[in-house]
Amino acid sequence: LSRLVLYKRPEMNNPITVVGFGGWADAGNVSTLSLAYLRESEGAIELGRLETSDLIDHTQHRPIVTIEGGFIREIRMPGWEIHYAMRKDADLILVSGYELSHGWDQFIRALFELMDTFGSRTLVTIGGLIDRTPHTRPVRLSFLTTSKRLYGKCMALGLNPSNYRGPASMHSYIIHNSGLKGLEAVSLWGHVPTYLNIPNPRVVLAVLEKLSSILEISLSLERLYVDAAVFDSKVNSLVESDEDLKEIVRSLEQEYDEQERNRVSYID
């Protein structure tokens, strides 16, 4: 039985599928905020859903209840929503929800069914991770991919190829299976300062700027530039008023600068 439910079947132009979700790999809300911003800025329209409620840990991602005058009016279960945006260069399919506690293989089948239905051959996931990086330096971004072409683009843009061994998120599972299916796929990760695990529009902006460059699509990021500037101003004021925090930032700046000096540049 398919977990994909479509409300409509529009004709799409070379659609790119972008996936983001809350959970373990959403530091700074980078993943969820990126998808929310794309839905709003692109005027995305509801396309369907993935029936995954039974695969979500409801103690971690609880249903939303509406109670009025002592009566329950609605209980809305968490799930996965699908939106689409029609564009001049390439259409977007936006898939968002919460990391599943199990049944990842069922999710992948539904996701690939969605992509096959609309002829999407390119997939992007967006994640956020906590890192020893200061907010006063350029946002550090890393990636993993299935494609030598996308690898070259990411390296040329200054992104760091991921090196990691440990518990996997759904991102890795999605990218791995995309490679097995022969899709061009890339997972972009925004690095969030250890002392700032709060909604971070600055990192979201950096991720979406690079997404635009890697895939050669235009994105409207004007509001994010404003949000990031306001965020920076507030964080700078906070740091200036806290000597301990100021020392943490100084130490991370030195560490960041040393790593950048020792970094090997990439020539495509």
Where in this protein do the model-derived segments appear?
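N-terminal short beta-loop-beta anion/metal-coordinating cradle
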Residues: 1-99
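A generic structural motif
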Residues: 48-54, 122-127, 222-225
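Catalytic cores of processing enzymes, dominated by hydrolases/peptidases
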Residues: 132-214
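Internal, conserved structured core segments that host functional sites
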Residues: 90, 98-149
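Conserved active-site and cofactor/substrate-binding residues in soluble primary-metabolism enzymes
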Residues: 29-33, 102, 106, 165, ...
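A conserved C-terminal secondary-structure "cap"
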Residues: 196-268
